[in-house]
Amino acid sequence: MEIKRDRYLNKLISFMWDGQVKVITGVRLCGKSYLLRNLFRAYLLEEGVPADHILSFELDLTRDIRYRNPLELANRVREIVENQREQFYLFVDEIQMSDEVPNPYNPDGKKITFYDALNDLKSLSNLDIYVTGSNSRMLSSDILTEFRGRSDEIRVHPLSFAEYYSAVGGDKEDAFENLRAL
């Protein structure tokens, strides 16, 4: 069963390659990751983007735990993207799990955060950046403040009945009762 979130998908599509960090915010479990990793990824693949040009880091998974370090993330992405002519897409899911790390050049100074890494990566003209996270306070206030004028917010809401019904179909009253039982 695929749940269409066309309103949000179309918003992401409209923001493509605008030079901004796309920040997908919303309450927990409202479909931010699904929108990015399933719907938007499928759109890119249908448009002919090679799968290996979609760089995806899921910071809540152990396989990507090293990329919670913003320096590791930035270095890995630069390794892949820098000096390439092709366009790449960067998806960072659960960005609130990223760490702050000491600055190796100024250990007593301000720590390096994911804002620093994203700002650095934003300078790559062949990279389009998308991030999600569950801590909506951190994302919607902190990152949008940090990137004032340099980010687009896509605020995702829980499923509407119309979205739910479009996925399950059948009798509307039965669908409504099933939804209430969830």
Q: Which residue ranges define each predicted feature?
A:
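Pre-Walker A adenine-sensing motif
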Residues: 1-19
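Conserved Walker B catalytic segment
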Residues: 96-130
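Interdomain motor-coupling "hinge/lid" segment immediately C-terminal to the ATP-binding subdomain
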Residues: 140-182
